Every structure is written in structure tokens, then in C-alpha cells.
Amino acid sequence: MKLITIVGARPQFIKAAAVSRAFKEFFEIEEIIIHTGQHFDANMSDVFFEELHIPKPHYNLAINSLSHGAMTGRMMESIEAVILKEKPDYVLVYGDTNSTIAGALAAKKLHVKVVHVEAGLRSFNTKMPEEINRILTDRISDVLFCPTNEAVKNLNNEGFQNIDCQIIKNGDVMQDAALYYKDLAKKPS
């Protein structure tokens, strides 16, 4: 199976690293990582990726410092080009950023299945751009990985049990990452 992972914000790299480790340990998945550049930071150099055991992106789109609409639109165009080139079975997105919604929309429009990690989380404040991204990404996803029972409940309250998608309570991927890095920090340098 081939999967594209979309990341753009720093926390998404930490989450993606935890999931990538699980892919390598338990599954035969070819993972292609796209960094949209949403939160570009010169400090996220090779050392950052090496020290935190984060897989380096295969593609860096370098899209940042734009309005929400311009950023999301450019991300969709660039992600679409990679999807067409790589032909994945799934596109995996995390959380609620512009990278999340751009990846989900690009995949869905190309009839590629969308997997959303951290699905069902809600602030119930639709004035927040992140809340709009969460709701829309959940609506178009095929597989929804929820970190909590409350997240599953939110999806059920929104009628997701009547939508053709899979809802899975998987726990908090950030907790998995914290446990991994805690053990790593205990090792002598």
C-alpha cells in the first residue's frame, strides 16, 4: 500500500514521526511525506529531523506567509500534482491546519481515500479557522482516527454514523510521541 502523509506545522511532524514508526514496525506501507511549508522555520534543519527521529519529507512545497485562502489554494495545487505523480492509495492528514484541509480536499477531488488523525475534536467556535478546517476535513474523510471518546461522540452527534466512513478511537498520538521521546531522553548521549 502507498500512502502520502501531509504535514506543515511543527506539531504535525512530531505526530507523523510516531505514526511513521508504527508503519515501519507493524505494516508494509510505502510512505511519501509532503511538507507544505506552512510553518517554515530555518531551525527545522537536518539536525531537527535527525535528533527527533523524524522522517525527512520527500517533497517540500515551501508555501507560507500568505492569507488563509491563498495558502490553502496553492497547497491544493501543489499537493494535487504530487498525488497525480505518486498515485497513492491513501492521503493521511493531521489536525486542523491549512495543510490538513488542503491535503484532504486535493485527495478527495482526485478520488483518493482520506485518513484524518485527530478527527472529531471540536472547539465549537466556528470563528476559528481551525474549527472550520476540522469540520470540513472530517466530512470528507474516509477513515477518522479519534483520540478520545468525546471526539467519537462529537462525530456521532453530527450524524457521522450515517456517513460511509470508518470511525476508530485510537488514542492520542501526541501521548505516544511523548512516551517515545521520554525514553529517548533517558538514553546517555
Model features per residue range: what roles?
Residues 2, 30-32, 113, 166:
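Residues at the starts of beta-strands that form the adenosine-phosphate
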Residues 2-22, 170-189:
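Active-site donor-nucleotide binding/catalytic segment of nucleotide-sugar enzymes
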Residues 4-6, 13-22, 48, 60-162:
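Active-site and donor-binding regions of nucleotide-sugar-utilizing enzymes
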Residues 5, 33-35, 116, 169:
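Structural beta-sheet core signal
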Residues 8-9, 36-38, 119, 172:
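Cofactor-binding loop segments of dinucleotide-utilizing enzymes, especially the Rossmann-like FAD-
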Residues 26:
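Acidic-histidine catalytic/liganding microenvironments
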Residues 29-71:
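Conserved nucleotide-sugar phosphate-binding/catalytic loop shared by glycosyltransferases and other
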Residues 39, 43, 140-189:
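A nucleotide-sugar donor-handling region in carbohydrate enzymes
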